[in-house]
Amino acid sequence: EGTAFLKNESAFRIHSPRQFSKVQNWLQTDVDITLTDWAQLTVIGRILLDPTGHLETNTHDFNAGPIDRAEASDFFQAELRELYLEVVYGDFDFRFGRQQVVWGESLGLRILDVINPQDFQEFILDDFIDARIPLWGTRIDYTFRDWVVEAVWFLDFEENRLADHGSEWQFRNSALPSTASATSAVPARIVSPKKPRDGNVRDSEFGFRLTRFLRNMDVSLNYFYSWTDFPVPFRRSLGMNDLRIEPRHKRSHLIGGTWNYAFNVFVIRGEGGINLGQHFVSNDPTNRDGITQRE
């Protein structure tokens, strides 16, 4: 069984410079292949064509896998969005492969919906289903009476994708530590980010979700141990004339929960979370690495 759709998204700047900022043509195919009564293979692929040549070109991680994403130029992209095998066995539901995992109840907000990194090539205008970057991993659901236990594990790492430098969607105010100090004002050199290793168990990400239906209300408790999707820009001084910004991804713990309550034709939703170990840029020039951490 398969479906496909064509879509065009075009935008024209009415102020200088008067030009098309994009004429983006999508072709996406979704194929579900039933292997047995208890196993199904899903493949989702997407091709983008933009004759204006405004597709982003340097925002992805080739090390994540050579079949994830291919580009011939800045007007053509082909991407394997999802490829996973789903197996249902008794009270267990297994999903192996490249996939999206969606947590949370909020509409238009990503409080707990942070399992997959996000594509910011058009800032936050894309629908989340298109903006999420699928990852290679495993999801397991176990149903026991009114309880559902979900576990996720990812050996694949990708960071958030930003728009190219010079794009109208570029983050203009990228937060970097102050490069001034009490004794020096040397311009800083930004080095390439240090990323977690794909396929390394010690660098993997994992999480759990416990869900229960209770008196017309669905409630959940969530936990996710992950890497920051944006690298933390640490400042490092190697001498009077050698000041560097060394971005590194750091570990974080997300703890939260959700609930939704249905009555008549109405549904009330709630969601909250706390991110432990989050890092923030410090404007204090006496701060050694330019970063403060929230415990």
Locations of regions flagged by a protein language model:
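Residues that define the transmembrane beta-barrel architecture of outer-membrane proteins
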Residues: 12, 19-27, 76-81, 88, ...
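Outer membrane beta-barrel
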Residues: 39-173, 215
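Flexible, surface-exposed loop regions and adjacent strand-edge segments
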Residues: 21-23, 58-64, 111-117, 159, ...
